[in-house]
Amino acid sequence: MNYDFKTNCDSNNNCNSNAKNSSEIDLDNLTFEFISEINDKLYEYLSNIANICNKFDNVKNTFFIDNEDCETTIDNEPNENIKDNNTLEDNYSKVIIAIKDKTIVGFISIYLIDESTAEICGFVLPEYRNNNIGNYLMEKLSYEMEDFYISIPVAKDNKTAPNFLRTNGYYPSTTECSMVINTDNIVEKPSSFDCSIDFKKTENEDEIIFEIFKDNNNIGSCFVSIFETCGCIHNVEINEAFRGNGYSKLLLQYSLYDIKNICQNIILHVTKENVPAYNLYKKLNFITTSEIIYYNNL
């Protein structure tokens, strides 16, 4: 189907803040489509809608589609290999769009994490809000993904989404923090009065693994993915029997000091509910750059 992209926003995505109300919009022609293949033109439409909504709401939400998801082939011949290479994503929609008079006025984007979990995000053009379009989209989603646990990431400064999500039965569950440290601020060398502690470093392509040993036994590790200007710490783990003794701090100090000369910044993600880890990163001078609140319907 061919769509039009129309909005009351100008070329710089500045929108008329006086969005139309329900008495001005005839919803009789409102239809919905479930789409599993995204072409370049549809991707452009959805990107424009997301950008307009972000500017109108003064937030930076993204949606779970990139250019790699776009179907660019024009070969209509059947491919016998497609069925054999079928993936989980092939069985479900990537996006649900709301259409009025051939114009896309809103959509929900779906990212499948595994066979039972999905994340979603949604946008409705400002001039079409307050007409239950978002609620209708959520209703369509509930039928399409009824067997899935749905999680919805919302930027902490998003003032529009929380009330809408609560109306649809979604409530805050966890808060994920993005944290960063500039490597110029890493000055403390790892130190331990315990001579039984040792470290090991293993370098792979674009990744470094740091391990901590006590009495020659591995008691923990962390991974650092290396990018052009930053490193990303993840999978920090200390064996349960050795937790609460400061070994996480020693491991991280060793890792940070080792990579400080190859990265400009080091980033990580942690949930605020993981209080010991969150407090440790703050003690190591990581600062929080953004917070995402996850809503779910359980």
List where the protein language model places each region.
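Intrinsically disordered, low-complexity terminal tails and inter-domain linkers enriched
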Residues: 2-25, 67-91
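Short amphipathic alpha-helix that is part of the acyltransferase structural core
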Residues: 2-6, 21-65, 171-217
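Conserved donor-binding loop and adjoining core beta-sheet/short helix segment
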Residues: 54, 58-75, 84-131, 135-136, ...
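Active-site acidic-Proline motif in GNAT/NAT acetyltransferases
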Residues: 125-127, 131, 239-241, 245, ...
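Conserved acetyl-CoA-binding loop-helix of GNAT-fold acetyltransferases
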Residues: 130-143, 244-257, 279, 283
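Conserved active-site alpha-helix within GNAT-family acetyltransferase domains
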Residues: 135, 156-175, 249, 273-290
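Conserved GNAT acetyl-CoA-binding A-motif
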Residues: 145-157, 261-269
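Glycine/small-residue-rich hydrophobic helix-like segments
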Residues: 218-261, 265
